[in-house]
């Protein structure tokens, strides 16, 4: 993901010595027979200009996260774990649901879309264990869009 090449069937693993044989067999099936184009693109990832660009993007994603997560927390949409490497925020919306008379994150996501004009994903899309109280936000948007989303949520949640 760091190189923006998800789905290219390329990769490597770092594992303890005792797992090398087993993981090697698994890895062969995950990224065997990479095309020449994919291999050349992968090599280009390690050029100085490419690495500088990836570091710039990483810093931009970090800045977005560092703005957005505290802003969600201030709105009462608690993010229990600070994302480290992902561009999503997993936020607890149960207090907001109780305040707004909403049943769960499904209703919260629907209301956020139609009332605040902010698209989020209900937790149940990611499993069944305690997901009804969580929603997922993307922080991959521009900083301007994240500011707009927070402003809209704030106006909706704290009238």
Descriptions of predicted regions:
Residues 1-159:
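PLP-dependent class I/II
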């Amino acid at each position: 993901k760091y190189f923006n090449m998800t789905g290219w069937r390329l990769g490597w693993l770092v594992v303890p010595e005792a797992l090398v044989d087993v993981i090697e067999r698994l890895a062969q099936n995950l990224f065997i027979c990479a095309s020449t184009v994919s291999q050349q693109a992968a090599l280009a990832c390690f050029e100085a200009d490419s690495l500088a660009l990836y570091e710039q993007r990483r810093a931009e994603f970090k800045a977005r996260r560092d703005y957005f997560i505290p802003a969600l927390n201030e709105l009462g949409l608690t993010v229990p774990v600070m994302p480290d490497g992902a561009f999503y925020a997993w936020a607890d919306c149960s207090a907001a649901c109780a305040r707004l008379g909403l049943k769960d994150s499904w209703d919260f996501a629907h209301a956020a879309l139609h009332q605040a004009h902010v698209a989020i994903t209900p937790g149940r899309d990611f499993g069944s264990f305690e997901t009804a109280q969580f929603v997922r936000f993307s922080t991959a948007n521009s900083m301007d869009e994240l500011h707009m989303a927070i402003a809209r949520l704030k106006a909706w949640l704290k009238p």
